[in-house]
Every structure is written in C-alpha cells, then in structure tokens.
Amino acid sequence: ASSVDVAFTPDVLQLEGYCNQLDSDAFIPFSSEDLSAEMAKKGERYYQVVDEIIELLSADNNLETSRKGLKATGYRKGYTRSLYIDEFTVTINYDRDMWKNPKTLECPFWIAFRDHEWQQTEPICEKLKLFPEYHKEYFWNMTFLPLIPLQNATFSEVCEDIKEQISKYLQLIREK
C-alpha cells in the first residue's frame, strides 16, 4: 500500500500547487487605496444611484407609482429596489455578478419589468426579444436590461439619464 502512496505523491503535490496558484490568482491583494475611506465612498455611490432613481421615478407626476410592501434589499453581490409603476413592477439592481458577466454589457445597473403578480408575462417577454442578447442578463428567473450610467457626469445627471432610459424602456414595453 505504501508504494501506491509514493506513486501518487507527485500528482498530489502538483494538484496542491495548482490549487494554491488558483487561490493566489483569484485574490487581488489589497492596496492602501483599497483600504481608504475614499474607496468606501466610491462603493457607496452605486447604492445611492439606485436609491435616487427610485426617488426620481416616485416623484414623477406622469407615473402612477407605489412602494407599498416593497423594501430595499442588499445581498452579497449587490442591491435591489422595486417600484410599482403603472401596470408594471420595476426592479432596479446594482449587481456585481451581472456587471462581470463576459456575455453582456459591462454595466453595474440593470432593470427588470414584470406585472403586479411579479411575473414576466408573455407580452413583456416578447418585447424583451427585441433587444440583442448582450443587452440581456438572465438572473432570478427574469430578464434584465442594462441601465448604462453616464461617465464623467454629476450624480444628478447620471440619475436623470438613467430615469430617461427607464422611461424609454417603459414606452417600448407598453407599445402594442
């Protein structure tokens, strides 16, 4: 039995080295900048954008909105907020997994449209087929569309522009 153990020792050592290399490659070491208060502020921006978009949509007198029974939800890889807008339930996500997906746009913000029963009905799904695949993310049994933030813009400009993107999506989804 000991000769078998000795025969596999190089394989085990090679596998152990490979696993250590994977661990090393997957973890990006912290820099002093990563641990600064400024980095914490940068990370907070994504949550603030989602919250502000919900506020802007709620304040729009052209939309019938409600947050009744809905709450903000943070999770390990992101943050989500929902809002009833007219006949739809709109869910806005900041999600790092969606952001990192190599098959879709590199985008931190995504939106899903459902009915008030929280279903992506056939008419909604038909409208979503109009978008190219790289503009769609499939997550939580829903199809999400990107909300592309402006670069080098103020907080207000970013949020207003995303609200306008949502308005265009709503218009398209409503079309008969």
What are these regions (language model features)?
Residues 151-176:
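Long, solvent-exposed, polar/charged low-complexity segments
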Residues 1:
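Catalytic cores of nucleic-acid endonucleases
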Residues 18-21, 52, 56, 127, ...:
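Residues that form generic nucleotide/phosphate-binding pockets
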Residues 4-35:
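A conserved mid-domain beta-alpha-beta active-site/ligand-binding segment of alpha/beta enzyme cores
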Residues 4-6, 12, 49-50, 90, ...:
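Extended aliphatic helical segments
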Residues 25-150:
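Polyanion-binding interface signature
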Residues 11, 20, 39-40, 72, ...:
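Short linear sequence motifs
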